Every structure is written in structure tokens, then in C-alpha cells.
UniProtKB/Swiss-Prot annotation:
A Pfam family of this chain: S-methyl_trans
EC id: 2.1.1.5
Any one Gene Ontology cellular component term annotated for this protein: cytosol
Phylogenetic placement of the source organism: Eukaryota, Metazoa, Chordata, Craniata, Vertebrata
UniProt function note: Involved in the regulation of homocysteine metabolism. Converts betaine and homocysteine to dimethylglycine and methionine, respectively. This reaction is also required for the irreversible oxidation of choline.
Quaternary organization: Homotetramer.
Species annotation: Xenopus laevis (African clawed frog)
Record PROSITE patterns: HCY
Single Gene Ontology BP annotation: methylation
Needed co-factor(s): Zn(2+)
Cofactor note: Binds 1 zinc ion per subunit.
Protein name: Betaine--homocysteine S-methyltransferase 1
């Protein structure tokens, strides 16, 4: 195994123009496998089921990922004891973060991958806690990342650039490279700050890599990063670009992204992007100048492999996972059925409009679009579980807003 520090670092790779491939969506993948609870989406599985987390890391590594992101999404102390999710009573936030770092490092050392320690938005910010309090939460995670000597840091999944800036400022205290991504679309963050301005603020706070992750489909994320790039150029601020989108089609989303869709989170399967969609995304991102290209919720290892295969000419090699995957379906030449063998060609898959097989379902949905954000009563943090009356009130609101 390669010793820690022997590999080229993140900025060394990006400065040289190399493509860095991120991994995929751990919370969604592990929820489907039975290791994460939908709702809180917290990562205690790192402690409770380390073998499941380790295996998913390995699958992304085999698919071509250069980064093993620690499974520390929503691993802040306040999130681990929020709305009846009493994880912190059994497993400390420190323990979750430590074990997640160890697993990521173990797998990263099996290949040419870096370890990224990640923090994300907090219930405390949404509850209007002070900058000092919110930064204190990030700093607890950072202490673990420094102790475990991660290679770089990611502030990801922020709906408000203000909180993301606070996270970047804390992570910069480590002296390690920092990447920062917002879960926003072309309309900007939930306070109306444009993507271009968001990118400038993140870069000025100390992020060497800026971009978007989650909430929107691949091509929407590319469009958003294009606006970020334009903002950076106009402000004469330099930063590398990064995209880690959903693996779901979201043309009907509002400002909040896929969380507003009525199918979220248990009926999103008809929206899953194909591996061929990901080829198009990877090429579009690369052509825009993005060099850190990965995925988020819904991204499985075969999606990551599609990025690696599309950009194999630029990278100079294919991932190990391609040993069992013929380029553009060429492996179908071995199929028993002749009509399937006839599909062993690129133009077939590029031109195919996949059917959903659901004749009585709409192709688009109407987003809920409640419009609540930081400071709203329904977003205030509470340790106690949602009460029956609170749930009744929400259902009543839902009925009013739907009408």
C-alpha cells in the first residue's frame, strides 16, 4: 500500500490539469442497502456497519474514483441528536468521524486515491445560532480530520453561502487544501446570492476549489458552475471548479432542488440517470474547464465508472471496473439473443430515449416549494422527536399549499 503523503496532492493534480474523479452518494446508496435511516440521513453506519461503508468505498475506488470522501455527511454533534435521532446518546460524533476517517484511509491506500474530510450544513445554522457556535461545531470535526491527517477538506452541501464561508474559514485553519460546494442551482442560494457571487465569496474565504453538489441533475449543475466560473473571471479571482451532482433528472425542480419534489426520497427511481447520461455530463463538465468531477445522491459506482471511461483519453487509462464493462455496450456482442447483440454499439445507446414503463405516470411533477429557510419555525432545531401535533400541523400546511 502507498504510504500516506507519497501520492500527489489535490492541488498538485489540479494545477497540472489532471482530472480528479470524486466518489458517489453514500447516504442514498447505504439507505437502499439497509444501513442508513432516511430522514436524519446520519452516518453512524461507519461505526455500526464498517464493512458496508468499506465495501462501498472499494466499489467507488474500483470504478475510478481518486477521492475517498470520509462518510461524515451530517456527522456534526447537533445533527446526531436532532428531532428524535438520538445517535449521540450511543455513539459520539467524535467516534463517527474517527472511524469514517480510518475506513476511508484504509481503502484509499489500496489505490491512487486521496482522503477528503467533509463537513456539511448544520441544524444550528438553520436555527439562527451564532457564527461562533456554528464554527465551533465545524471545528470539532476538523480536530478529528487533523488528527487523522486527511489529505484535504471539503465543505459540501450548503444551501446558504454564508454558512459555507464560515465552514471554509474554519477548515482553512488546518493549512490543508479546502474545496467547497453549494447545493444550489442557477438561481443561487436560498438568500438569493447568485452562483457567481457565491463562488467569489467561497474563494476569497480560502477555498481553492469551488462548485456545486447534490440537489440538481448533472447538466443543471454544469450550468450552475458555468455561472460560477463567469463570476470568478469577472472578479479576477482564481479557483479550480468542481461538480458532484445528483444521479436523478430534475428539470421540474424549484430553487430547493429535488427535496421539493413529491417523489423525494422514496420514489425517485424513475428519474435515475443512465450511464450514458453520465458520459455526456462528464464531457460537458470537462469542456467547461471542470477538473474535479464526481457525484452525489443517487450516484452508484457504475455512474462513477462512466465518468472514468468518458475521460479515459484525457487520463490515459481505464479504471479496474472497466475490465467487466465493454465500451459503449460492446460486451453485448457475447449475448445469446441476436437483437441484443445488435445493441452493441455507441449510436444505439446515445440515441435511445429510455421509457419509464409507467404509462399512467406524468413525466414531470409539481414541486412543493414551501419556501422556508433559515429562521423559519419549522426548521428550528429540537432534540425531541417530532410530535403528533407537529406532524398534523405540517400535513395541514401541505394540504393548504397544494391547493
Amino acid at each position: 500500500m502507498a504510504p500516506v503523503g507519497a501520492k500527489k496532492g489535490l492541488l498538485e493534480r489540479l494545477d497540472a490539469g489532471e482530472v480528479v474523479i470524486g466518489d458517489g452518494g453514500f447516504v442514498f446508496a447505504l439507505e437502499k442497502r439497509g444501513y442508513v435511516k432516511a430522514g436524519p440521513w446520519t452516518p453512524e453506519a461507519a461505526v455500526e456497519h464498517p464493512e458496508a461503508v468499506r465495501q462501498l468505498h472499494r466499489e467507488f475506488l474500483r470504478a475510478g474514483a481518486n477521492v475517498m470522501q470520509t462518510f461524515t455527511f451530517y456527522a456534526s454533534d447537533d445533527k446526531l441528536e436532532n428531532r428524535g435521532n438520538y445517535v449521540a446518546e450511543k455513539i459520539s460524533g467524535q467516534k463517527v468521524n474517527e472511524v469514517a476517517c480510518d475506513i476511508a484511509r484504509e481503502v484509499a491506500n489500496e489505490g491512487d486515491a486521496l482522503v477528503a474530510g467533509g463537513v456539511s450544513q448544520t441544524p444550528s445554522y438553520l436555527s439562527c445560532k451564532s457564527e461562533v457556535e456554528v464554527k465551533g461545531i465545524f471545528r470539532k470535526q476538523l480536530d478529528v480530520f487533523i488528527k487523522k491527517n486527511v489529505d484535504f477538506l471539503i465543505a459540501e452541501y450548503f444551501e446558504h453561502v454564508e454558512e459555507a464561508v464560515w465552514a471554509v474559514e474554519v477548515l482553512k485553519e488546518s493549512g490543508k487544501p479546502v474545496a467547497a460546494t453549494l447545493c444550489i442551482g442557477p438561481e443561487g442560494d436560498l438568500n438569493g446570492v447568485s452562483p457567481g457571487e457565491c463562488a467569489v465569496r467561497l474563494a476569497k474565504a480560502g477555498a481553492s476549489v469551488v462548485g456545486v453538489n447534490c440537489h440538481f441533475d448533472p447538466m443543471t449543475c454544469v450550468a450552475t458552475v458555468k455561472l460560477m466560473k463567469e463570476g470568478l473571471v469577472a472578479a479576477k479571482v482564481k479557483a479550480h471548479l468542481m461538480t458532484q451532482p445528483l444521479a436523478y433528472h430534475t428539470p421540474d425542480c424549484g430553487k430547493q432542488g429535488f427535496i421539493d419534489l413529491p417523489e423525494f426520497p422514496f420514489a425517485l427511481e424513475p428519474r435515475i440517470v443512465t450511464r450514458w447520461d453520465i458520459h455526456k455530463y462528464a464531457r460537458a463538465a470537462y469542456d467547461l474547464g471542470v477538473r474535479y468531477i464526481g457525484g452525489c445522491c443517487g450516484f452508484e459506482p457504475y455512474h462513477t465508472r462512466a465518468i472514468a471511461e468518458e475521460l479515459a483519453p484525457e487520463r490515459g487509462f481505464l479504471p479496474k471496473g472497466s475490465e467487466k464493462h465493454g465500451s459503449w455496450g460492446s460486451g453485448l456482442e457475447m449475448h445469446t439473443k441476436p437483437w441484443v447483440r445488435a445493441r452493441a454499439r455507441r449510436d444505439y445507446w446515445e440515441k435511445l430515449p429510455p421509457a419509464s414503463g409507467r404509462p399512467y405516470c406524468p413525466s414531470m411533477s409539481k414541486p412543493d416549494e414551501w419556501g422556508v429557510t433559515k429562521g423559519d419555525a419549522d426548521l428550528m432545531q429540537q432534540k425531541e422527536a417530532t410530535t403528533e401535533q407537529q406532524l398534523k400541523d405540517l400535513i395541514a400546511k401541505q394540504g393548504i399549499k397544494s391547493n
